[in-house]
Amino acid sequence: MIQQEEIRKLEEEKKQLEGEIIDFYKMKAASEALQTQLSTDTKKDKHPDPYEFLLLRKIKHPGFNEELSPC
């Protein structure tokens, strides 16, 4: 009887720990996805096109007579 009770407690503890492991991996995956997204956004902003704002506002490039066209 005592041995069966100990086995039952250990099985419950095992289930709880397995659930915590699953939750940990879910949080880890979400964190990695967010980190990847932020890293990608940072790389895009690292070397922005200096004339992109001109395209967005339809402003002519100084020194040129025509509007800039998207590359």
Curated annotation (Swiss-Prot):
One of its GO terms (biological process) is mRNA stabilization. Detected in colon (at protein level). Changing residue 63 to A: No effect on binding to IGF2BP1. It comes from the Eukaryota. Enhances binding of IGF2BP1 to N6-methyladenosine (m6A)-containing mRNAs, thereby contributing to increased mRNA stability. Also increases the interaction of IGF2BP1 with RNA stabilizers ELAVL1/HUR, MATR3 and PABPC1, and increases the interaction of RNA stabilizers ELAVL1/HUR, MATR3 and PABPC1 with m6A-containing mRNAs. Contributes to MYC stability by enhancing binding of IGF2BP1 to m6A-containing MYC mRNAs and increasing recruitment of RNA stabilizing proteins to m6A-containing MYC mRNAs. Promotes colon cancer cell growth, colony formation, migration and invasion through enhanced stability of MYC. Expressed in colorectal, breast, ovarian and nasopharyngeal cancer cells. Higher levels are found in colon cancer cells than in adjacent nontumor tissue. Interacts with IGF2BP1 (via KH3 and KH4 domains); the interaction results in increased binding of IGF2BP1 to N6-methyladenosine (m6A)-containing mRNAs. This is Putative RNA-binding regulatory peptide.
